């Protein structure tokens, strides 16, 4: 087996689809010696900000001197990004070796595991092999029935900002979504919540009480954003002053405040995480594809916001960083998202739209998306593919800003197409 065939196995059609439940993951991990039982975790669930918060947590823990695993999804440029130790992606040869180990166990299962369950097993094997002190583990979807939820009580559970997304899988109300996320709360294990949505907060508080899990809700009254530009946003939070965060979205200081609160909870449990390490970790964090500036002038932004809740935060960031400016939007949206609400948020800032379809069956066809925009009075044209879309958006943008957004699934392709275009 080589790297390409290992990826083909992971992505094989037989594993496709979302099947909630923990039994398959437990069976698979048991056949592999239960590697997760050797590890300690920070478990991160939520609608938006999971990846950014997880990246901040991992960066700060590494700055404190720990060997840190980071498990996230989806990848932007390369599959190996999903499984990292101290900022280094799993090497190709190690991935091949672990796939060869997982394959017979997975193939022997009557109830075949999903792709995500296989990747979770690969991550657990690598983190155990690398003797990680702690693993920052991002939930794939929901919480209660997500395959990452097979772990024993973590060092801390973290619940990021909640909003309406994945309602088909999680339920039609914010309380349903909160209940799914709160499923990661374990007996006696502390939980830190972003908060701010009363109906969701009530659910999380109830579950925490039932599980005898100490609950901390982030006190955003202690957060003061000092300023932001296209290089960093500077903020003070709860005694940490003048932190320069290189993630420039206007929403990122709140994610940082969540991470800081969780790190201080870990410190109260005996982890040696001085504020100096928290500052260093935040100032060195990298998280591609989230309000990321690929070019300063004229600006070309890449953003992975993929639901109305995320687009609302991105729109605020665009207003803050580019006051009074209109954008050419390169847009791809999954067909199961609230397209009309996302467009309603974007249209006031739009000069024009160029639509494309990301390389996933869930993507809305480019022409269908363009028709949605035109029906709302916007200017839109559909591009044949992502490279053509990038080229057209840059052409239409001229000296003005361009923003590519709507899904993380096209971020890698957009980045590559933009790099080729600007290298010519």
Residue ranges and their predicted role:
Residues 194-216, 230-234, 299-302, 308, ...:
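C-terminal helical cap/extension that packs against the catalytic core
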Residues 44, 52-69:
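A conserved segment at the C-terminal end of the G1
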Residues 38, 134-137, 145-158, 162-163, ...:
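Nucleotide phosphate-binding/pyrophosphate-handling subdomain across enzymes
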Residues 1-16:
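Charged, amphipathic alpha-helical linker segments immediately N-terminal to NTP-binding catalytic cores
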Residues 110, 118, 131-138, 154-239, ...:
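Acidic, Mg2+-coordinating active-site environments of NTP-dependent enzymes
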Residues 18, 22, 26-38, 63-152, ...:
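ATP-dependent carboxylate-amine ligase catalytic core
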Residues 407:
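Active-site-proximal loop/hinge segments that shape catalytic or ion-binding/gating pockets
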